[in-house]
Amino acid sequence: MEFKLKHKDGMARVCEITTAHSTFLTPVFMPVGTVGAVKSLDANDMKNELDAKIILANTYHMYLRPTSKVVKDFGGLHGFTKFDRSFLTDSGGFQAFSLSKNSKHFNEGIEFKSHIDGSHHLFTPKSVLDTQYDFNSDIMMILDDLVALPATKERVKISVDRTILWAKEAITYHKSMQNKGIGIGQNIFGIIQGGTDYEERKRCALSLNEMPFDGLAIGGLSVGEENALMYETVQNLNPYLDENRPRYLMGVGTPEDLVENVERGVDMFDCVMPTRNARNGTFFTSFGKFNIKKAEFINDHEAIDPACSCYTCRNFSRGYLNHLFKAKELTFFRLASLHNLHYYLELARKMREAILNNSFTQFKRNFYHLRGK
């Protein structure tokens, strides 16, 4: 991976990241392709309609089905999905924690039951990397020990101890595998845990900073805490993060979350919110969000967002989309997902532009003004 810090405006940053499959600027939003596809969209949509440079796929889901061996047989994620730009794969730890009713965390790894057939599995720091080697993802995430918030101080300390232990095991294993010719061209990110405990977050960040990860992620936020506490936690971490590595806030979030955390120095984001909300009829726009199922849109000839240049807004009216949603027409999911993802990707582009122009503060003011805030 090549990383260049191009410009700063306060804490907000524009960076250039080059992997084996694409070059992209940050702040960047990564659409989530949980099972190897962004829901209702294909590789052509991602490249030609949205111009996404990097997307996320989920290790837990693709490990269980179709299995990493099947994906490897197709030439990795790029050959399997035909998306030939960058892939980031998470470790699967969050899904093992959240989808399995009886997951167990111990120092060797995470034991869990498949949500598909109830079979028993064990994720370890080494095994999740082996799975991601099969995927040939451009950026691999290490296994970390996530805790739901609120959590006791003792449980947070155990989480940080375990995450540091697993990080050491993962980076040592990755370097040894690269020496054997495996994982060449693949990059590895560490994950900082610690809940909202300042000292534990600091301890975890300082420990991971000493390890030769290609980037660092902030995990374990947006899992039950108030937004203000999330923003404070990210801001407090800033002095302890290496300026010359990417910073990735995992699983976050709303448009407001992106703006607030870019202001606090975050480079990379992912979230299922744009596509999940699309399937429920909720659209993100420059003036806020609204749900298309309301009767007021039946005869509305306007585009979802007159200021938007996405395929959906260029071609279809609110009235038509209201009809498709109420008719449960599958076409709706694609059109709504295209719009919401375009909105998120365009928001990231506008933030990059504002940072480069030293006008991020004004951008943020206008962002909230359009929402009546």
UniProtKB/Swiss-Prot annotation:
It catalyses: 7-aminomethyl-7-carbaguanine + guanosine(34) in tRNA = 7-aminomethyl-7-carbaguanosine(34) in tRNA + guanine. InterPro entries: TGT (IPR004803), TGT-like_sf (IPR036511), tRNA_ribo_trans-like (IPR002616). Its EC number is 2.4.2.29. The active site is at D90, D270. Gene3D superfamilies: Queuine tRNA-ribosyltransferase-like (3.20.20.105). Belongs to the queuine tRNA-ribosyltransferase family. This is Queuine tRNA-ribosyltransferase.
